[in-house]
Design a protein with these regions (language model features):
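Ligand-binding face of N-terminal immunoglobulin V-set domains in extracellular IgSF glycoproteins
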Residues: 30-59, 64, 73-81
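A short, structured loop/turn motif at beta-sheet edges
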Residues: 27-29, 43-48, 104-107, 124-133
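Extended, low-hydrophobicity, Ser/Thr/Pro/Gly-biased non-transmembrane segments
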Residues: 75-100, 104, 111, 137-187
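Outer-membrane beta-barrel and related beta-rich outer-membrane complex signature
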Residues: 63-69, 148-150
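Short strand-edge motifs at loop-to-beta-strand transitions and within beta-strands
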Residues: 116-120, 132
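N-terminal, polar/Ser/Thr-rich
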Residues: 1-33
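Beta-strand-rich interaction surfaces with strong enrichment in secreted/lumenal proteins
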Residues: 10, 21-24, 108-110, 121-126, ...
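Short, hydrophobic/aromatic-enriched beta-strand segments in well-ordered soluble domains
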Residues: 36-38, 42, 55-57, 130-144
Length: 187
């Protein structure tokens, strides 16, 4: 579908995902809870037997690839205070998506959780031009940004107030492209 230049060719297509999201930030527990409806339309010429969602917050699970492969000393010959602070925080933090519920058109979905992604197996192939509606409920605790240095979390101040930083915070459809298929590499 693409010429040698890499630009889209004459048969280019692009998938469509429309989101309706409701979110609640609980300042006291430093957590968020959300529900969303994703209407996903298959504009590719292929029949899809499954779709993938990105669950970026699962990077903070104790058994995530990131945590299992990261040397806690940061790869240095010595350990600094910020590295010890991160390790101490992560040792007691219960991270990742909690209470994850996924339905397709109102029916519990058959899923395979794979780290920072989840594969949603469809009961029938999703043909070109067809849409499905995914209903997703979820919650997770926020990390302390000063300890973990993440794109998502909270920062506390001496006066007792917090600033909340939210990026990559909701389950979202993984890219499905004409040149790579599903972009489901672990985050």
């Amino acid at each position: 579908n693409r010429p040698a230049t890499g630009e889209p060719g004459p048969n280019y297509w692009q998938q469509r995902a429309d989101y309706k999201i409701k979110i609640k930030l609980d300042e006291a527990s430093r957590s968020i809870q959300g529900s969303e409806v994703i209407t996903y339309t298959n504009n590719s010429p292929l029949k899809l037997n499954y779709v993938w969602l990105q669950l970026d917050q699962n990077i903070f699970e104790k058994d995530s690839i990131n945590n299992l492969t990261r040397p806690w000393w940061g790869g240095n010959n010595s350990v600094d205070f910020s590295t010890l602070r991160r390790q101490n925080f992560m040792d007691t933090f219960d991270g990742g998506f909690q209470e994850l519920s996924i339905k397709i058109n109102g029916k519990d979905a058959r899923v395979n959780l794979v780290g920072t992604h989840v594969r949603i197996n469809l009961d029938a192939p999703l043909n070109n031009g067809e849409s499905i509606e995914l209903e997703i409920d979820w919650a997770y605790a926020l990390v302390e940004e000063n300890a973990v240095r993440a794109r998502n979390g909270y920062e506390s101040f001496e006066d007792g107030n917090d600033i909340f930083l939210l990026a990559q915070w909701y389950p979202r459809i993984t890219v499905f492209s004409d040149y790579e298929g599903w972009h489901n590499k672990e985050f």
